[in-house]
UniProtKB/Swiss-Prot annotation:
Region of interest (Interaction with CALM), residue spans: 219-243
Leader sequence segment: 1-21
Segments for region (Interaction with HIPK3): 201-306
The organism's taxonomic lineage, starting at the top: Eukaryota, Metazoa, Chordata, Craniata, Vertebrata
Annotated GO MF terms: calmodulin binding; identical protein binding; kinase binding; protease binding; protein-containing complex binding; transmembrane signaling receptor activity; tumor necrosis factor receptor activity
Originating species: Rattus norvegicus
Record-given protein name: Tumor necrosis factor receptor superfamily member 6
PROSITE patterns per the UniProt record, alphabetical: DEATH_DOMAIN, TNFR_NGFR_1, TNFR_NGFR_2
Transmembrane segments: 172-188
TNFR-Cys repeat spans: 43-79, 80-123, 124-163
Sequence positions bearing Phosphoserine: 214
Membrane side Extracellular: residue ranges: 22-171
SUPFAM superfamilies xref list: DEATH domain, TNF receptor-like
Length: 324
């Protein structure tokens, strides 16, 4: 009787025990299958990349891939990046080089290290500018302490630290500021009286520019205008003259790291859409509306000077011919 009770649990557990063992066998088979798939997924050694049946070496820094290798372990056909325009700074499998960064002077930046085929441009803040962020795409003017003492001078990575004024200095400034305000108003009124168009200024107003000057070819002045504008000024000018937003985005996409090229392309796009007739006058008026009167007056002065020189040269030639 005792042996029947001992054997009965084993008989009842038999099917369940068999199922568990079969399940365990299936798990082991699945693991083996995964291991086999993993081994066939990557047949190349570290540092190589697979192209069909071949494991190819990468291109070296300063190069881009032109054609994959044709033998396992072989090197692809690689061409050098354009010096001063493109770079790659590590081994890679790409068919493109990276575009060199542009240090925008309008944002207070200057070149620290020129771009090479193996190294990107390194920018830094110009003198009297600073940036205290880890990645800087815009530098700020250093603070001037004025009559205060300087505790720490401005560096390229930190702003000036000034010593706080005493109450006596504050009282002095309260006495000086009204006088400075009066002086500013006086100078401003004098300046307004000598705006272009005033006979004493020697510079005609945009409305009084003769037709032959108004229709001057602006191509030689486009880059000078762009050089003095910030990228935000150029975009504002383009939008004021109905340049489509899609065209502005296209220009930015074509030269993503080159703000100088973007400014030139924006102005050239406007010039092409406007046409030569009246373009000089439209450019000067547009710059004034964009609150860049300084650029407008400088461009107008250059155009007027070139016009006067052209007239003078023509007179000299005519006089020389009459003497002959």
């Amino acid at each position: 009787m005792l042996w029947i009770m001992a054997v009965l649990p084993l008989v009842l557990a038999g099917p369940e025990l068999n199922v568990r063992m079969q399940g365990t066998d299936s798990i082991f088979e699945g693991l083996e299958l995964k291991r086999s798939v993993r081994e066939t997924d990557n047949n190349c050694s570290e540092g190589l990349y697979q192209v069909g049946p071949f494991c190819c070496q990468p291109c070296q820094p300063g190069e881009r891939k032109v054609k994959d290798c044709t033998t396992s372990g072989g090197a692809p056909t690689c061409h050098p990046c354009t010096e001063g325009e493109e770079y790659t700074d590590r081994k890679h499998y790409s068919d493109k080089c990276r575009r060199c960064a542009f240090c925008d002077e309008g944002h207070g930046l200057e070149v620290e290290t020129n771009c090479t085929r193996t190294q990107n441009t390194k920018c830094r803040c110009k003198e009297n500018f600073y940036c205290n962020a880890s990645l800087c795409d815009h530098c700020y003017h250093c603070t001037s302490c004025g009559l205060e003492d300087i505790l720490e001078p401005c560096t390229r990575t930190s702003n000036t630290k000034c010593k706080k004024q005493s109450s006596n200095y504050k009282l002095l400034w309260l006495l000086i500021l009204p006088g400075l305000a009066i002086l500013f108003v006086f100078i401003y009124k004098r300046y307004r009286k000598r705006q272009p168009g005033d006979p004493e200024s020697g510079i005609p107003s945009p409305e009084s520019v003769p037709m032959n000057v108004s229709d001057v070819n602006l191509n030689k002045y486009i880059w000078r205008t762009a050089e003095k504008m910030k990228i935000c000024d150029a975009k504002k000018f383009a939008r004021q003259h109905k340049i489509p937003e899609s065209k502005i985005d296209e220009i930015e996409h074509n030269s993503p790291q080159d703000a100088a090229e973007q400014k030139i392309q924006l102005l050239q796009c406007w010039y092409q859409s406007h046409g030569k007739t009246g373009a000089c006058q439209a450019l000067i008026q547009g710059l004034r509306k964009a609150n860049r009167c300084d650029i407008a007056e400088e461009i107008q002065a250059m155009v007027w000077e070139d016009h006067e020189n052209s007239i003078s040269n023509s007179r000299n030639e005519n006089e020389g011919q009459s003497l002959e």
